[in-house]
């Protein structure tokens, strides 16, 4: 189980890297992930909270257990942007004193502005005034020095260390110049006095601190925006509920509501907790939770979720889940936990950040030494070294990945797509093969009546006869007929002597005649059926439908076709995946004929039929040999396959087990959200790469420029103040680039492009076709398929009992005798192998 902590005192990627290393060394810690963006840490393992906090404090930072109060308000407070107001006050004060300092130090020289009379020819007074103003600005921004030197003492230098050293060095050298100038004036050396006057860097020391504060404030403000989606979710949680106690309405805080309590909700109010409607009807706006903009009609017996809005009627509800067990709380937990994890691509930046600051300090010292050896003055060499310190920015590197992940995660949450980890958000876009479970994923998972073909009676009469016998059955196909008849307000006939013919059909007595319903094979054995009618039934079967025959006495009443119909959006979703260069595979336990009919309508690339529930995981494992696999499912039997896949996606309406096993949850239960999730992942990953590129290139170009590498060749020279300005904007630019993701329409497929990839599948894979006698049904297909795929050399077996064949794909040579024996051991006869 992951323990979450709040971490204080971190200012850049070097800090988060230091904390991560310190905690990882604690005995019992299995993994540790620190987020600079949310100032949080996730730790897995058996280590105690006390030992983890002690390790963080030893590293020079503060830590506390997150969510100790376990209240929404505590989480909201944690995400509140507390830094921007503080930095704004610091900035206003710094700019005020800096303006005076710049006026005194440079105004009269650059623009000829007049100085106060008491400064006239009083160089020591001017120096002391600059010293005093600089000290005030340093006190205002003392946090840089406290954190910076604390990091240096703990041997974990960070960005604040670079700022403190840069500004501090400018200040110390300026103080030295002031004392030297005072000595020269006492000795009456006017020329030396003027020389030391130009060695003052008080304005540089102050400007560095002010400009870095500007950058920090912009960065904090932008970082605050990246958590807007999570804050919006937290704000959805209602604060109060109206309970019904002894028939009276009593307003209480939501944390007082218990499971089983009855409460009322009026139009326009938010649902306080997850509940079931016990009285009334309404339409509920679930857009904040699922991204679905159209209100959903709700009646007695339907469930409603916390945070959704009652748009229409007055309803009474019974609480079914409260506190952290509500759907809203679970969504918040998923998004929050994902923010605390790290994407694999972040490891590059982490490794660089760990050595970045010490390396920059060394480069700055080398720069100073080289310029001194080249004969330059101490002031000139120091200016080059300070420029190196203040232009270098580990923050941009550290923020490149987490800000993009946070924004991407928030965008997904707004659309009802929940990524459980940062890794799942990164990996989804690399999908090469999408495996879709048929029932409940491509199809609705509920059989429906698709065709009614009566003979010499009306459709309603046929449906009424069928309804009369099916109403007493629990079979899923019977339920489809019942729903259809009840939808037309039909009443069943009063039948007697109901019988269930095992494996064949149903029958009952009505007006002295037997009404019988069943399969084509069963009814054909009772009465003669014309070839024309049989061909109609065969056509229905080819379309993936199940034709049910009904007769009365010795007369055929008609055919009712039932099918698990394809969701309206399924073909569109599959087409979008294919346009992204993703191969779409449909996985089902149905017989090959029905499966291929559904697959054709849906437009999938490949159909794998006859797969037993326990065989789905094996199919996914085999497909992984060809490329990265994304599995989409909703049932208990999908859980192993979801876990086995590189990325598992669960339909939100599916079972808890499937949702727990998945990496991504689709709250709207729409297949079109699969390409949306892939599209979001690809765009987020691209944004991360852009951020990392600019963060790296900024430092690669900036550090040599600051060190003065180009001065001998091109005369390019960087003033420390411009270096500080560049540093202050670098992190802001990275965060702003991540925020651009918010303007990307992840539902628009127009800019999708195919990503070509090399298949892992062996190009020399062989296939063999086996002619098999004795297979009678889909169960036979499953037995043969399972036995053949049990061979190590067989990657796939496509079996058809109707064709009497098995097409076997081999990854290595296997003798025909072995294949033959494998099938015949199951009780079937192998005629030939080619």
Question: Which residues fall in each region the model found?
Answer:
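Conserved catalytic phosphorylation-site environment of P-type ATPases
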Residues: 289, 348, 383, 396-469, ...
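P-type ATPase nucleotide-binding
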Residues: 449, 453-580, 592, 604-620
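Flexible metal-binding regulatory segments at protein termini and peripheral loops
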Residues: 1-125, 150, 232, 248-251, ...
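Juxtamembrane coupling segments of multi-pass membrane pumps/enzymes
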Residues: 181-184, 190-191, 206-267, 298, ...
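Conserved cytosolic catalytic loops of P-type ATPases
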Residues: 26-50, 199-200, 231-325, 422-466, ...
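Transmembrane helix-loop-helix hairpins at the membrane interface
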Residues: 86-240, 351, 715-720, 726, ...
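Conserved ATP-binding TGD loop and adjacent catalytic N/P-domain core of P-type ATPases
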Residues: 17, 30, 341, 431, ...
């Amino acid at each position: 189980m992951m323990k979450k902590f709040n971490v204080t005192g971190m200012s850049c990627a070097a800090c988060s890297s230091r904390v991560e290393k310190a905690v990882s060394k604690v005995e019992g810690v299995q993994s540790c992930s620190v987020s600079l963006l949310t100032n949080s840490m996730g730790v897995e393992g058996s280590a105690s909270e006390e030992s983890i906090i002690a390790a963080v404090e030893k590293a020079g930072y503060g830590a506390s257990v997150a969510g100790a109060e376990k209240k929404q308000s505590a989480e909201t407070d944690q995400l509140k942007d507390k830094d921007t107001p503080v930095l704004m006050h610091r900035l206003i004060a710094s700019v005020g004193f800096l303006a005076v300092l710049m006026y005194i130090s440079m105004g009269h020289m650059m623009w000829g502005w007049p100085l106060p009379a008491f400064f006239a020819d009083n160089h020591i007074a001017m120096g002391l005034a600059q010293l005093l103003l600089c000290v005030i600005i340093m006190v205002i921004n003392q946090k840089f020095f406290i954190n910076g030197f604390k990091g240096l003492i703990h041997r974990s230098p960070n960005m604040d260390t670079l700022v403190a050293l840069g500004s501090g060095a400018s200040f110390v050298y300026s103080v030295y110049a002031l004392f030297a100038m005072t000595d020269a004036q006492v000795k009456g050396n006017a020329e030396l006095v003027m020389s030391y006057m130009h060695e003052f860097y008080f304005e540089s020391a102050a400007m560095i601190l002010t400009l870095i504060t500007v950058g920090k404030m912009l960065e904090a403000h932008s970082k605050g925006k990246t958590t807007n989606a999570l804050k919006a979710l937290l704000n959805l949680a209602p604060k109060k509920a109206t309970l019904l106690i002894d028939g009276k309405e009593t307003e209480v805080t939501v944390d007082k509501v218990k499971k089983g309590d009855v409460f009322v909700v009026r139009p326009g109010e938010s649902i306080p907790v997850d509940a079931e409607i016990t009285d009334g009807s309404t339409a509920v706006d679930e857009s904040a939770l699922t991204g679905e903009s159209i209100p959903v009609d709700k009646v007695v017996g339907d469930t409603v979720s916390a945070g959704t809005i009652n748009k229409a009627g007055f309803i009474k509800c019974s609480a079914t889940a409260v506190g952290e067990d509500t759907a809203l709380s679970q969504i918040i937990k998923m998004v929050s936990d994902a923010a605390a994890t790290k994407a694999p691509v972040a490891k590059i930046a982490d490794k660089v950040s760990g050595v970045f600051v010490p390396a920059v300090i060394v480069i700055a010292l080398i720069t100073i030494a080289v310029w001194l050896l080249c004969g330059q003055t101490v002031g000139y060499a120091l200016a080059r070294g300070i420029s190196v310190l203040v232009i270098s920015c580990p923050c941009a590197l550290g923020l490149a990945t987490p800000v993009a992940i946070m924004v991407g995660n928030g965008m997904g949450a707004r659309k009802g797509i929940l990524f459980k980890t940062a890794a799942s958000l990164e990996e989804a876009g690399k999908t090469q093969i999408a495996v879709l479970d048929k029932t409940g994923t491509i199809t609705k998972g509920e059989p429906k009546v698709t065709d009614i073909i009566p003979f010499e009676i009306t459709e309603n009469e046929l449906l009424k006869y069928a309804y009369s016998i099916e109403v007493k059955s629990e079979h899923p196909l019977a339920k489809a007929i019942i729903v259809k008849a009840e939808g037309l307000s039909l009443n069943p006939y009063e039948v007697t002597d109901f019988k269930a013919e095992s494996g064949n059909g149903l029958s009952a007595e009505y007006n002295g005649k037997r009404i019988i319903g069943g399969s084509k094979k069963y009814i054909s054995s009772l009465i003669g059926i014309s070839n024309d009618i049989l061909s109609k039934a065969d056509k229905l079967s080819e379309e993936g439908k199940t034709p049910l025959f009904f007769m009365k006495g010795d007369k055929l009443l008609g055919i009712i076709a039932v099918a698990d119909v394809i969701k309206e959006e399924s073909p569109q979703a599959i087409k979008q995946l294919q346009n992204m260069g993703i191969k779409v595979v449909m996985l089902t336990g149905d017989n090959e004929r029905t499966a291929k009919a559904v697959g054709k309508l849906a437009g999938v690339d490949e159909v794998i039929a006859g797969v037993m529930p326990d065989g789905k995981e094996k199919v996914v494992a085999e497909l992984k040999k060809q490329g990265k696999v994304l599995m989409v499912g909703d049932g208990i039997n999908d859980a192993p396959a979801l876990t086995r896949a590189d990325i598992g996606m669960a339909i939100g309406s599916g079972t808890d087990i499937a949702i727990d096993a998945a990496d991504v949850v689709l709250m709207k239960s729409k297949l079109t959200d699969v390409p949306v999730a892939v599209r979001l992942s690809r765009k987020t990953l691209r944004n991360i790469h852009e951020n990392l590129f600019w963060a790296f290139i900024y430092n690669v170009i900036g550090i040599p420029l600051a060190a003065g590498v180009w001065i001998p060749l091109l005369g390019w020279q960087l003033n420390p103040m411009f270096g500080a300005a560049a540093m202050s904007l670098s992190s802001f630019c990275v965060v702003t680039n991540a925020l651009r993701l918010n303007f990307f329409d992840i539902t628009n497929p127009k800019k999708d492009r195919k990503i070509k990839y090399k298949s892992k599948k062996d190009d020399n894979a062989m296939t063999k076709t086996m002619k098999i006698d004795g297979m009678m049904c889909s169960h036979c297909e499953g037995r043969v398929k399972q036995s053949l795929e049990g061979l190590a050399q067989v990657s796939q077996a496509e079996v058809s009992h109707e064709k009497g064949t098995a097409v076997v794909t081999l990854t290595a040579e296997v003798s025909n005798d072995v294949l033959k024996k494998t099938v015949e051991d199951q009780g079937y006869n192998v005629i030939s192998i080619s």
